Amino acid sequence: MYTAIVNLKTYREATGANFTRFMEKFEPVQGKFELIFSPSLLDLEKAAKCGKFRFFAQHVDAEPYGAYTGHVPMDMMIDLGITGSILNHSERRLPRDTIINTLKKASKLDFTIVLCVENAEEAKYFREYEPDFIAYEPRDLIGGDVSVSTAKPEIIEDIVKIYEGTGTSVLVGAGIKTGEDVRRSIGLGARGILVASGVVKSADPTKSLNSLIELK
């Protein structure tokens, strides 16, 4: 089974009053992909009440309940029914010690982490902490039309080799727009994709997502 994570970011099309309408476009699929959506933090409570899909946060903190103004406690996520989160996205980068503390807490609480990295060196650094997913997204390709599977296939292969023999699944993001991009990524050893604008800002989000996950 492969994994497709759709990051809704804070795109107006899928946020706030538009979140429920956006999600109503989709139905669970029977196929080779598990679908996971990542709404904005302000929409997580609504997401938790939507039983059709699994939802991950876009960011989470290791700090517990308490005097932590502005933080997003992992414990609170779990109590809300959210079972995982993206971490260290290029639009929300974190210090390495913060990432390590968060990974350690997530491991104890059985909370899934999708750790974003920008290069193979960064991927290798976090190997010993065994994130559930490692998502390779070079910053310069995010939101563009050039797929990482075309521009930097050798780095995908390097990261797959780094995590060979572990329980970590490698995802590929940045510029993923077509089924061929997905097939090429999987051919390089990836176990799924992390996408955003190619689905959320599409004129037909359902069609765009289906075109990515209908492997032949």
Swiss-Prot record:
One of its GO terms (molecular function) is triose-phosphate isomerase activity. It is found in: Cytoplasm. It catalyses: D-glyceraldehyde 3-phosphate = dihydroxyacetone phosphate. GO terms for biological process: gluconeogenesis; glycolytic process. The keyword Cytoplasm applies. One of its GO terms (cellular component) is cytoplasm. It is an enzyme of class 5 (isomerase). Involved in the gluconeogenesis. Catalyzes stereospecifically the conversion of dihydroxyacetone phosphate (DHAP) to D-glyceraldehyde-3-phosphate (G3P). Homotetramer; dimer of dimers. Belongs to the triosephosphate isomerase family. This is Triosephosphate isomerase. It comes from Thermoplasma acidophilum (strain ATCC 25905 / DSM 1728 / JCM 9062 / NBRC 15155 / AMRC-C165). The gene is tpiA.
